[in-house]
Amino acid sequence: VKLAVFLGPSLPWAEARRLAPGATLLPPARQGDLWRALRRRPRAIALIDGLFEAQPSVWHHEILDALDAGVAVFGAASMGALRAAELGSSGMIGVGRIFGWLRDGAIRDDAEVALLHAGREHGFRALSLPLVNVRAAAALARERRVLTGPLAQALIESAGRIFYQERTWPAVLAEQRWTRRVRERFGALALPDPKAEDARACVLEAARFAGSGALLPVKPRAQAESSLVRRARAWDELAVAQARPDAAALADAGLRRALLAGWARSLGLAPLEPDLARARLRIRAGVARDEAERLAQDLA
């Protein structure tokens, strides 16, 4: 195997086969899949799509191990762009516009590339709209003078408030207070698909490398803190917490907080900025929430 490509909703497999006829196509990567791919002894790996949330995501260490083995690892479009932005200094090769946005800090949230998609039997068809596509559409609309700067920003912000599994163009456009003329002009645009564009570029670049005799440039591996060290420190902190007289109450509060956070994510809920600001202030002041609420009532 010269090239292994982890690909799902970003680009149809049929198109990837046309771009790189000899490539081995694999479904979106989950934790451990790059280690398994190394058994095929590829010259290059193109990491495009990957699983998250319900499945453990691709681990940084498996990418670093591939690089240490002399395998070129390219990343783009989705999970690949995220990991390439994080591991570019270690030798992973990022490709495309989304990678550039992440590398330069224009976007920071992993949720920007998240979407809901069908399974392999349905060709990993995208069922929702990633926020990066809305950003690209807003930029195009502003460039073509269809949207003003404020309207383009409002389009992105309103799309970001919709839970990623429920975000579609009809849902996003229903939130916009545009004139009929603006809607008609926006509807006439050929909306970009940066995920597909970046995936194509990544497959082509990885295929060119895999088919050449080029060697991977050697870069010093960044010394990441071992997971064993992190786990040992976590156990130490847990032992200190368990020795406290209120350990049971702390455990109950932590479990409740984790369950509520997971429930909120499943409903697509996110805290408002004023709530976040108050929480940050309480943390800096070292004041518990119930104490802050009692103080607010006393001052009212």
Question: What do the predicted segments below correspond to?
Answer:
Residues 79-118:
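Class I SAM-dependent methyltransferase SAM-binding "motif I" and its flanking Rossmann-like core
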Residues 58-71:
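Catalytic-core regions built around general acid/base machinery
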Residues 172-246:
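Acidic catalytic cores of enzymes that act on phosphate-bearing nucleotides/polynucleotides
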Residues 234-300:
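Peptidyl-prolyl cis-trans isomerase
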Residues 43-52:
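Short, basic, glycine/proline-bearing loop/turn elements
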